[in-house]
UniProtKB/Swiss-Prot annotation:
Provenance organism: Mycolicibacterium gilvum (strain PYR-GCK)
Positions that bind carbamoyl phosphate: R55, T56, R105, H138, Q141, G266, P267
Protein name as annotated: Aspartate carbamoyltransferase catalytic subunit
Swiss-Prot/TrEMBL catalytic activity: carbamoyl phosphate + L-aspartate = N-carbamoyl-L-aspartate + phosphate + H(+)
Binding site for L-aspartate: K83, R171, R225
Protein backbone atom coordinates (compact mmCIF):
# COMPACT_ATOMS: atom_id res chain seq x y z
CA UNK A 1 0.00 0.00 0.00
CA UNK A 2 1.59 3.25 -1.18
CA UNK A 3 -0.86 6.01 -0.18
CA UNK A 4 -3.79 6.59 2.18
CA UNK A 5 -6.14 8.87 0.27
CA UNK A 6 -9.59 7.60 1.26
CA UNK A 7 -11.01 5.18 3.79
CA UNK A 8 -12.13 3.05 0.85
CA UNK A 9 -8.43 2.42 0.10
CA UNK A 10 -8.35 0.21 3.19
CA UNK A 11 -9.28 -3.44 3.00
CA UNK A 12 -10.51 -5.07 6.17
CA UNK A 13 -7.09 -6.68 6.61
CA UNK A 14 -5.28 -3.35 6.09
CA UNK A 15 -7.51 -1.54 8.57
CA UNK A 16 -7.20 -4.30 11.17
CA UNK A 17 -3.41 -4.37 10.80
CA UNK A 18 -3.24 -0.61 11.34
CA UNK A 19 -5.47 -0.78 14.43
CA UNK A 20 -3.46 -3.70 15.83
CA UNK A 21 -0.17 -1.87 15.28
CA UNK A 22 -1.59 1.28 16.85
CA UNK A 23 -2.22 -0.74 20.01
CA UNK A 24 1.30 -2.20 19.79
CA UNK A 25 2.86 1.24 19.52
CA UNK A 26 0.82 2.45 22.49
CA UNK A 27 1.94 -0.50 24.59
CA UNK A 28 5.59 -0.11 23.52
CA UNK A 29 5.66 3.52 24.66
CA UNK A 30 4.08 2.94 28.07
CA UNK A 31 6.58 3.67 30.83
CA UNK A 32 9.31 4.96 28.53
CA UNK A 33 11.09 7.98 29.94
CA UNK A 34 12.01 8.99 26.38
CA UNK A 35 9.17 8.32 23.96
CA UNK A 36 11.27 7.32 20.97
CA UNK A 37 11.29 4.28 18.71
CA UNK A 38 13.83 3.90 15.86
CA UNK A 39 11.21 2.69 13.38
CA UNK A 40 11.48 5.60 10.91
CA UNK A 41 15.01 6.80 11.63
CA UNK A 42 16.41 8.46 8.51
CA UNK A 43 12.98 9.05 6.95
CA UNK A 44 11.71 12.55 6.12
CA UNK A 45 8.05 13.41 6.65
CA UNK A 46 6.63 16.72 5.47
CA UNK A 47 3.25 18.01 6.64
CA UNK A 48 1.40 20.41 4.34
CA UNK A 49 -1.51 22.09 6.13
CA UNK A 50 -3.50 24.56 4.05
CA UNK A 51 -6.38 24.64 6.55
CA UNK A 52 -6.34 25.28 10.28
CA UNK A 53 -5.76 22.23 12.46
CA UNK A 54 -4.74 21.42 16.02
CA UNK A 55 -5.36 17.73 16.71
CA UNK A 56 -4.45 16.31 13.30
CA UNK A 57 -1.38 18.45 12.66
CA UNK A 58 0.05 17.98 16.15
CA UNK A 59 -0.64 14.24 16.27
CA UNK A 60 1.04 13.61 12.91
CA UNK A 61 4.06 15.62 14.04
CA UNK A 62 4.24 13.78 17.37
CA UNK A 63 3.76 10.42 15.61
CA UNK A 64 6.67 11.06 13.27
CA UNK A 65 8.96 12.30 16.01
CA UNK A 66 8.16 9.40 18.34
CA UNK A 67 9.25 7.12 15.48
CA UNK A 68 12.53 9.07 15.06
CA UNK A 69 11.61 10.54 11.66
CA UNK A 70 12.63 14.02 10.60
CA UNK A 71 9.38 16.00 10.51
CA UNK A 72 9.12 19.28 8.62
CA UNK A 73 6.01 21.46 8.70
CA UNK A 74 4.95 23.51 5.67
CA UNK A 75 2.05 25.97 5.80
CA UNK A 76 0.58 28.13 3.07
CA UNK A 77 1.42 31.36 4.88
CA UNK A 78 5.04 30.40 5.53
CA UNK A 79 5.91 28.95 2.13
CA UNK A 80 6.15 30.08 -1.49
CA UNK A 81 2.41 29.39 -1.79
CA UNK A 82 1.99 32.85 -0.25
CA UNK A 83 3.91 34.18 -3.27
CA UNK A 84 1.62 32.43 -5.72
CA UNK A 85 3.35 29.07 -6.15
CA UNK A 86 0.98 26.31 -7.25
CA UNK A 87 0.35 23.18 -5.21
CA UNK A 88 1.87 21.15 -8.04
CA UNK A 89 5.14 23.09 -7.99
CA UNK A 90 5.27 22.91 -4.20
CA UNK A 91 4.74 19.13 -4.37
CA UNK A 92 7.48 18.65 -6.97
CA UNK A 93 9.85 20.78 -4.89
CA UNK A 94 9.23 18.67 -1.80
CA UNK A 95 9.69 15.45 -3.77
CA UNK A 96 12.99 16.76 -5.12
CA UNK A 97 14.03 17.64 -1.56
CA UNK A 98 13.77 13.95 -0.64
CA UNK A 99 10.46 13.62 1.21
CA UNK A 100 9.48 10.05 2.03
CA UNK A 101 5.93 11.01 2.98
CA UNK A 102 3.72 14.03 2.35
CA UNK A 103 0.81 14.62 4.71
CA UNK A 104 -1.68 17.10 3.29
CA UNK A 105 -4.74 18.95 4.53
CA UNK A 106 -6.34 21.11 1.86
CA UNK A 107 -9.67 22.91 1.34
CA UNK A 108 -10.08 21.40 -2.14
CA UNK A 109 -11.61 17.93 -2.33
CA UNK A 110 -9.31 15.64 -4.30
CA UNK A 111 -6.08 17.55 -3.57
CA UNK A 112 -4.32 14.48 -2.05
CA UNK A 113 -5.10 12.40 -5.15
CA UNK A 114 -3.62 15.14 -7.33
CA UNK A 115 -0.56 15.30 -5.09
CA UNK A 116 0.00 11.55 -5.41
CA UNK A 117 -0.26 11.77 -9.20
CA UNK A 118 2.08 14.77 -9.48
CA UNK A 119 4.81 13.27 -7.30
CA UNK A 120 4.87 9.84 -8.94
CA UNK A 121 8.29 9.12 -10.45
CA UNK A 122 10.39 6.15 -11.57
CA UNK A 123 11.08 5.33 -7.91
CA UNK A 124 7.42 5.57 -6.93
CA UNK A 125 7.61 8.97 -5.26
CA UNK A 126 6.69 9.81 -1.67
CA UNK A 127 3.72 8.29 0.10
CA UNK A 128 0.79 10.70 0.37
CA UNK A 129 -1.55 10.73 3.37
CA UNK A 130 -4.84 12.59 3.29
CA UNK A 131 -5.22 14.60 6.51
CA UNK A 132 -8.54 16.03 5.33
CA UNK A 133 -9.53 17.39 1.92
CA UNK A 134 -12.49 19.75 1.74
CA UNK A 135 -15.74 17.93 2.48
CA UNK A 136 -14.39 14.73 0.92
CA UNK A 137 -12.48 12.45 3.34
CA UNK A 138 -10.41 12.21 6.52
CA UNK A 139 -9.32 8.55 6.68
CA UNK A 140 -7.01 8.72 9.72
CA UNK A 141 -9.84 10.24 11.78
CA UNK A 142 -12.01 7.26 10.87
CA UNK A 143 -9.22 4.90 11.92
CA UNK A 144 -8.78 6.52 15.32
CA UNK A 145 -12.55 6.53 15.85
CA UNK A 146 -12.67 2.82 15.02
CA UNK A 147 -9.79 2.15 17.40
CA UNK A 148 -11.56 4.03 20.18
CA UNK A 149 -14.76 2.06 19.62
CA UNK A 150 -12.79 -1.19 19.62
CA UNK A 151 -11.02 -0.31 22.86
CA UNK A 152 -14.25 0.69 24.60
CA UNK A 153 -16.55 -2.01 23.24
CA UNK A 154 -14.20 -4.88 22.41
CA UNK A 155 -14.84 -4.85 18.66
CA UNK A 156 -16.32 -2.78 15.85
CA UNK A 157 -18.10 -5.60 14.04
CA UNK A 158 -21.81 -5.78 14.79
CA UNK A 159 -21.87 -2.49 16.68
CA UNK A 160 -24.51 0.14 15.93
CA UNK A 161 -22.83 3.51 15.38
CA UNK A 162 -25.03 6.60 15.19
CA UNK A 163 -23.47 9.61 13.44
CA UNK A 164 -25.27 12.85 14.24
CA UNK A 165 -25.18 16.31 12.71
CA UNK A 166 -23.75 18.07 9.70
CA UNK A 167 -23.16 15.07 7.46
CA UNK A 168 -23.36 17.23 4.32
CA UNK A 169 -20.11 19.09 5.01
CA UNK A 170 -18.36 16.36 7.01
CA UNK A 171 -15.33 14.54 5.62
CA UNK A 172 -15.25 12.70 8.96
CA UNK A 173 -18.70 11.25 8.34
CA UNK A 174 -17.81 10.07 4.84
CA UNK A 175 -14.64 8.32 5.97
CA UNK A 176 -16.34 6.79 9.00
CA UNK A 177 -19.20 5.40 6.94
CA UNK A 178 -16.76 3.69 4.57
CA UNK A 179 -14.45 2.30 7.25
CA UNK A 180 -17.14 1.25 9.72
CA UNK A 181 -18.94 -0.59 6.92
CA UNK A 182 -15.69 -2.34 5.98
CA UNK A 183 -15.22 -3.40 9.61
CA UNK A 184 -18.75 -4.75 9.90
CA UNK A 185 -20.54 -2.08 11.90
CA UNK A 186 -24.11 -0.90 11.33
CA UNK A 187 -24.15 2.85 10.66
CA UNK A 188 -27.09 5.21 11.22
CA UNK A 189 -26.99 8.84 10.09
CA UNK A 190 -29.15 11.31 12.01
CA UNK A 191 -29.47 14.83 10.62
CA UNK A 192 -31.98 17.36 9.34
CA UNK A 193 -32.74 16.77 5.64
CA UNK A 194 -30.87 19.96 4.72
CA UNK A 195 -27.63 18.57 6.18
CA UNK A 196 -27.65 15.27 4.31
CA UNK A 197 -25.83 15.00 0.96
CA UNK A 198 -27.45 14.15 -2.34
CA UNK A 199 -27.12 10.42 -2.94
CA UNK A 200 -26.96 9.45 0.74
CA UNK A 201 -29.59 6.78 0.07
CA UNK A 202 -26.89 4.93 -1.92
CA UNK A 203 -24.56 4.79 1.08
CA UNK A 204 -24.42 1.63 3.26
CA UNK A 205 -26.32 3.36 6.07
CA UNK A 206 -29.74 3.87 7.61
CA UNK A 207 -30.95 7.48 7.57
CA UNK A 208 -33.08 8.99 10.33
CA UNK A 209 -34.19 12.47 11.32
CA UNK A 210 -35.18 11.51 14.88
CA UNK A 211 -32.28 11.49 17.33
CA UNK A 212 -34.39 10.45 20.32
CA UNK A 213 -35.48 7.27 18.55
CA UNK A 214 -31.92 6.21 17.73
CA UNK A 215 -29.98 6.91 20.94
CA UNK A 216 -31.32 4.00 23.06
CA UNK A 217 -30.22 1.55 20.33
CA UNK A 218 -26.71 2.97 19.89
CA UNK A 219 -23.45 1.34 20.93
CA UNK A 220 -21.53 4.45 19.89
CA UNK A 221 -22.61 8.00 19.09
CA UNK A 222 -20.40 10.21 16.94
CA UNK A 223 -21.39 13.87 17.20
CA UNK A 224 -20.39 16.15 14.32
CA UNK A 225 -19.64 19.85 14.46
CA UNK A 226 -21.87 22.17 12.45
CA UNK A 227 -19.40 23.57 9.92
CA UNK A 228 -20.67 27.13 9.64
CA UNK A 229 -17.54 28.15 7.71
CA UNK A 230 -18.68 25.96 4.80
CA UNK A 231 -22.27 27.23 4.82
CA UNK A 232 -24.01 30.20 3.23
CA UNK A 233 -26.89 30.03 5.69
CA UNK A 234 -30.39 28.59 5.52
CA UNK A 235 -29.55 25.02 6.53
CA UNK A 236 -31.53 25.28 9.79
CA UNK A 237 -33.59 28.06 11.44
CA UNK A 238 -31.25 28.82 14.35
CA UNK A 239 -28.45 27.38 16.47
CA UNK A 240 -30.88 27.04 19.36
CA UNK A 241 -33.39 25.04 17.33
CA UNK A 242 -30.62 22.83 15.97
CA UNK A 243 -29.43 22.13 19.51
CA UNK A 244 -32.95 21.30 20.68
CA UNK A 245 -33.47 18.83 17.83
CA UNK A 246 -29.99 17.36 17.35
CA UNK A 247 -27.83 18.28 20.33
CA UNK A 248 -26.67 15.61 22.77
CA UNK A 249 -27.98 17.01 26.04
CA UNK A 250 -27.60 15.49 29.48
CA UNK A 251 -31.22 14.34 29.30
CA UNK A 252 -30.59 12.59 25.99
CA UNK A 253 -27.42 11.03 27.33
CA UNK A 254 -29.49 9.37 30.05
CA UNK A 255 -31.29 7.34 27.36
CA UNK A 256 -28.04 5.76 26.16
CA UNK A 257 -27.13 2.23 27.18
CA UNK A 258 -24.61 2.08 30.02
CA UNK A 259 -21.94 0.66 27.71
CA UNK A 260 -22.46 3.24 24.96
CA UNK A 261 -19.58 5.54 24.08
CA UNK A 262 -19.77 9.17 22.92
CA UNK A 263 -17.27 10.43 20.36
CA UNK A 264 -16.53 13.79 18.74
CA UNK A 265 -13.80 14.54 16.17
CA UNK A 266 -13.33 18.09 17.48
CA UNK A 267 -13.31 20.96 17.69
CA UNK A 268 -16.47 20.77 19.80
CA UNK A 269 -19.12 23.47 19.91
CA UNK A 270 -20.04 22.87 23.53
CA UNK A 271 -23.60 23.84 24.29
CA UNK A 272 -24.69 23.39 20.69
CA UNK A 273 -24.15 19.84 19.40
CA UNK A 274 -22.96 18.49 22.76
CA UNK A 275 -23.58 19.59 26.33
CA UNK A 276 -20.63 20.52 28.55
CA UNK A 277 -21.50 17.77 31.02
CA UNK A 278 -21.77 15.12 28.29
CA UNK A 279 -18.42 16.06 26.74
CA UNK A 280 -16.75 15.66 30.13
CA UNK A 281 -18.63 12.53 31.26
CA UNK A 282 -17.27 9.02 31.70
CA UNK A 283 -19.09 7.93 28.53
CA UNK A 284 -17.20 10.53 26.50
CA UNK A 285 -14.09 9.25 24.69
CA UNK A 286 -13.01 12.61 23.27
CA UNK A 287 -9.59 12.71 24.92
CA UNK A 288 -9.07 9.00 24.28
CA UNK A 289 -9.64 9.79 20.59
CA UNK A 290 -6.88 12.40 20.71
CA UNK A 291 -4.46 9.96 22.34
CA UNK A 292 -5.40 7.26 19.85
CA UNK A 293 -4.81 9.72 17.03
CA UNK A 294 -1.07 9.71 17.71
CA UNK A 295 -0.82 5.91 17.81
CA UNK A 296 -3.02 5.42 14.74
CA UNK A 297 -0.93 7.88 12.75
CA UNK A 298 2.23 6.11 13.88
CA UNK A 299 0.69 2.89 12.57
CA UNK A 300 -0.31 4.50 9.26
CA UNK A 301 3.20 5.89 8.71
CA UNK A 302 4.64 2.48 9.53
CA UNK A 303 2.18 0.69 7.24
CA UNK A 304 3.05 2.92 4.28
CA UNK A 305 6.79 3.39 4.81
CA UNK A 306 7.87 0.05 6.32
CA UNK A 307 5.04 -2.42 6.01
CA UNK A 308 6.51 -5.46 7.78
CA UNK A 309 4.54 -6.31 10.91
CA UNK A 310 7.56 -8.00 12.48
CA UNK A 311 9.46 -4.72 12.51
CA UNK A 312 6.68 -2.61 13.98
CA UNK A 313 8.17 -2.42 17.46
CA UNK A 314 11.89 -2.46 17.94
CA UNK A 315 14.34 -1.12 20.51
Amino acid sequence: MKHLLTAADLSRDDATAILDNADRFREALVGREVKKLPTLRGRTIITMFYENSTRTRVSFEVAGKWMSADVINVSASGSSVAKGESLRDTALTLRAAGADALIIRHPASGAPQQLAAWTLDEHGGPSVINAGDGTHEHPTQALLDALTIRQRLGSVEGKRVVIVGDVLHSRVARSNVALLHTLGAEVVLVAPPTLLPVGVTEWPVTVSHELDAELPLADAVLMLRVQAERMNGGFFPSSREYSVRYGLSEKRQSTLADHAVVLHPGPMLRGMEIAYSVADSSQSAVLQQVSNGVHVRMAVLFHLLVGSEEEAISA
